[in-house]
């Protein structure tokens, strides 16, 4: 029996614990929707800035659509340690579920976080020297355009590092292609977040890719048990710790936006709870910002049935009530400082802790 076939049987075993909404797969690649999103990139708005911001978010909205590729999902099923993930999740759900109010799928993602961080993906400050194998003596020297071969795997640029031992230059392409990420299994925030979010979706879970204007990305998954979106960050093995960035890292943020197969949502208030943690939101006026996100969401949901649209509208309204409920004066749990990345790198990004 292939791993992919085993995955389907194992998922079916727990199907009764998933809602029909969760089990309903999106089309492998919804070409009509992707065409609408791309057309929206070229539409004019109130001004040039509005158009550029709209194009940026329409481009980002294509990322979760790429998670629906059936061939890539089959590749993921061959990689994921499904028996182990489900066994641990089932055991924890039986032992801790009632007390902690988490469901099987929540424990599944908790275990996926642990496996992804500890056993699967590797963080790269500088890549090891390919000639002498040195790790500690390799330093970044420049960034340059990716080669045609690197561009085949959607490299967004290539870093060049140099070994001080042997002077060898090592290329570190910043790949975005999911098949390549499953091959290289390494990177920084972008590679980690995209590959982890894809694995969540490959397991059949509703997943968001979370973009932050201050150069960090992570993910959220929808908890069917709690009926809410839950923060996940594979770089930190973090579960349901949305204030980790503002409290633990000392990171100030302006925009935090979630992209899923169901729409686009401004989730800044989940992650920024206090005025002194909020950077100015100056991309476009807030009303225009809402218009951009609503337009993209409308395009994504265009072909859904009236009942599906109504269900998502109810979810949107419930999430809006949740986000509006956060009290800036309420005590916040202490959070860990950033674990991933070198000290110099995190400090340069303003993520070295609240005393940075």
From Swiss-Prot:
The enzyme's E.C. designation: 3.5.1.52
Cofactor notes: Binds 1 zinc ion per subunit.
Reaction it catalyzes: Hydrolysis of an N(4)-(acetyl-beta-D-glucosaminyl)asparagine residue in which the glucosamine residue may be further glycosylated, to yield a (substituted) N-acetyl-beta-D-glucosaminylamine and a peptide containing an aspartate residue
Major location category of this protein: cytoplasm
Chain segments annotated as transmembrane: none
Catalytic residue positions: 189 (nucleophile), 216, 233
Cofactor: Zn(2+)
Presence of the UniProt keyword Cell inner membrane in the record: no
Residues engaged in binding substrate: 236
Region spans: Disordered: 300-356
Compositional bias segments (type: Basic and acidic residues): 307-316, 346-356
Protein's job: Specifically deglycosylates the denatured form of N-linked glycoproteins in the cytoplasm and assists their proteasome-mediated degradation. Cleaves the beta-aspartyl-glucosamine (GlcNAc) of the glycan and the amide side chain of Asn, converting Asn to Asp. Prefers proteins containing high-mannose over those bearing complex type oligosaccharides. Can recognize misfolded proteins in the endoplasmic reticulum that are exported to the cytosol to be destroyed and deglycosylate them, while it has no activity toward native proteins.
Family: Belongs to the transglutaminase-like superfamily. PNGase family.
Protein name (database record): Peptide-N(4)-(N-acetyl-beta-glucosaminyl)asparagine amidase
Organism whose genome encodes this protein: Yarrowia lipolytica (strain CLIB 122 / E 150)
